UniProtKB/Swiss-Prot annotation:
It catalyses: a 2-demethylmenaquinol + S-adenosyl-L-methionine = a menaquinol + S-adenosyl-L-homocysteine + H(+); a 2-methoxy-6-(all-trans-polyprenyl)benzene-1,4-diol + S-adenosyl-L-methionine = a 5-methoxy-2-methyl-3-(all-trans-polyprenyl)benzene-1,4-diol + S-adenosyl-L-homocysteine + H(+). GO terms for molecular function: 2-methoxy-6-polyprenyl-1,4-benzoquinol methyltransferase activity; demethylmenaquinone methyltransferase activity. The gene is ubiE. S-adenosyl-L-methionine binds at residues 83, 104, 132-133. GO terms for biological process: aerobic respiration; menaquinone biosynthetic process; methylation. Gene3D superfamilies: Vaccinia Virus protein VP39. Its EC number is 2.1.1.163, 2.1.1.201. It comes from Bartonella quintana (strain Toulouse). Belongs to the class I-like SAM-binding methyltransferase superfamily. MenG/UbiE family. Keywords: Menaquinone biosynthesis, Methyltransferase, S-adenosyl-L-methionine, Transferase, Ubiquinone biosynthesis. This is Ubiquinone/menaquinone biosynthesis C-methyltransferase UbiE. Coiled coil: none annotated. Pathway: Quinol/quinone metabolism; menaquinone biosynthesis; menaquinol from 1,4-dihydroxy-2-naphthoate: step 2/2; Cofactor biosynthesis; ubiquinone biosynthesis. Methyltransferase required for the conversion of demethylmenaquinol (DMKH2) to menaquinol (MKH2) and the conversion of 2-polyprenyl-6-methoxy-1,4-benzoquinol (DDMQH2) to 2-polyprenyl-3-methyl-6-methoxy-1,4-benzoquinol (DMQH2).
Length: 260
């Protein structure tokens, strides 16, 4: 176990930071909520900016690795998934047989998702729940899969959210997380840092009139645990068969784990 793992994976750490700014633990959730209320209508544009448009390919890879079955009794919980982007991809991959529950703490994000579900004819297959990832309002062993994309780094107490994920999964259930990660190629890292810290906040100001929100999102990526450290956190929460796949030079990573 590395010192970084000990700091973040066991004792916590991100609950005391808002990007690179140190804050009181009680402030974190409300500050993150403010960011996502402000970017909800432009969320896909935000991910396009943060990922150079690659998030769509990464999300397709996530759903392909999940490989949802075309079964009406198969249930997925998509956490921090308010706009429905991941849930809708999963439902379409299941030939519109599965059922998705989209959970988000942010009402503005959920509002966008509900409109999209109606527009795409997926409302009958989708429930939207406003709740906290750290305190899921579901019984034990309720879901076959738990997904979260670009959301776990915004949860104040990540370890608690992982314990809740483990609790609500059925035995044999799958955890799958897509998150920005620690770039492993030196040249790419320099280019991505230049893009992240010097270009993205300016684009955020121009496109969404909110450079500060985009600056937080960039900084939160840098504060998130490295791939191996996050794997340790999943093991610590009780998961087995933990693994990850780096995407595009590790700009992002897909983390997989099972409840055995």
């Amino acid at each position: 176990m590395t010192a970084e793992t000990e700091r973040i994976g066991v004792k916590g750490g991100m609950e005391y930071s808002f990007g690179f700014t140190k804050i009181d633990e009680a402030q974190k959730q409300s500050m993150v909520d403010g960011v996502f209320h402000s970017v909800a209508e432009n969320y896909d544009k935000m991910n396009d900016i943060l990922s150079l448009g690659l998030h769509r390919t990464w999300k397709n890879s996530m759903v392909a690795w999940l490989s949802p079955p075309a079964l009406s009794n198969w249930k997925v919980l998509d956490v921090a998934g308010g706009t429905g982007d991941i849930a809708f991809r999963i439902l379409n991959a299941s030939r519109k047989k599965a059922h998705a529950t989209v959970l988000d703490i942010n009402s503005s994000m959920l509002s966008v998702g509900k409109k999209r579900a109606q527009k795409n004819g997926l409302a009958p297959l989708t429930d939207f729940v406003e709740a906290n990832a750290e305190h899921l309002p579901f019984e034990d062993q309720s879901f076959d899969a738990y997904t979260i994309a670009f959301g776990i780094r915004n949860v104040p107490h990540i370890n608690q959210a992982l314990r809740e994920a483990f609790r609500v999964l059925k035995p044999g259930g799958r955890f799958l997380c897509l998150e920005f990660s620690n770039v492993e190629m030196p040249l790419l890292n320099k280019i991505y840092d230049l893009w992240s810290f010097h270009v993205i906040p300016k684009l955020g100001q121009f496109i969404a009139d909110n450079g500060d929100a985009y600056r937080y999102l960039v900084e939160s990526i840098r504060k998130f645990p490295k791939q191996d450290d996050f794997s340790h956190m999943l093991n610590h929460a009780g998961f087995s068969r933990v693994s990850y796949r780096n995407l595009t030079g590790a700009i992002a990573a897909l983390h997989s784990a099972w409840k055995i």
